[in-house]
Amino acid sequence: MLKFTGNCLIVPWDFSEMALAALKTSVAMVDDRAKIKVIHVGQIPTSTEPTVIWDTITEQSIQEYASKSFQKTVADHPELSGLELVTLFGDPGFAITDYAQEIAAELIVISSHGRRGLSRLFMGSVAERVVRLAQVPVLVLRGPAD
């Protein structure tokens, strides 16, 4: 396993098994877990017609849900202890790369879900966008193809 000798790396967190693999890989790459910044990018749903459900989804509720879910994951995987989650909002590609620049991160470790064909066309690829936008190296961990 390669060792990361820089000061800071970012791991985007989307609650998936692949994101968990990226976290575990990052932990194995560093000597000091404080170098790892785990981020989740939340998006508030938009609708042309406001409804009751949209009123209950706020940045605070997204942040609380992400924090609780991440804490549960850390509790289930002791090797991740000491990691903390930062929640950002906006377009995931821009939010991840802007935050990397803001905190002078030297590496982004991101998972890719392995989408192909129409699934990739319609859902896009955050990992691909991060690779295109990032000013720092990006390590992409590929998942199995759908």
Task: Pin down the residues of each PLM region.
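Small/aliphatic-rich secondary-structure junction motif
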Residues: 2-52
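Short conserved AdoMet
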Residues: 30-31, 78, 135
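General small-molecule cofactor/ligand-binding pocket signal
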Residues: 37-39, 83-88, 139
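Gly/Ser-rich helix-loop-strand patches that form or flank binding pockets
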Residues: 1, 99-146
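Short beta->alpha linker loops
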Residues: 65, 87-91, 113
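A short acidic, glycine-rich active-site loop
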Residues: 55-68
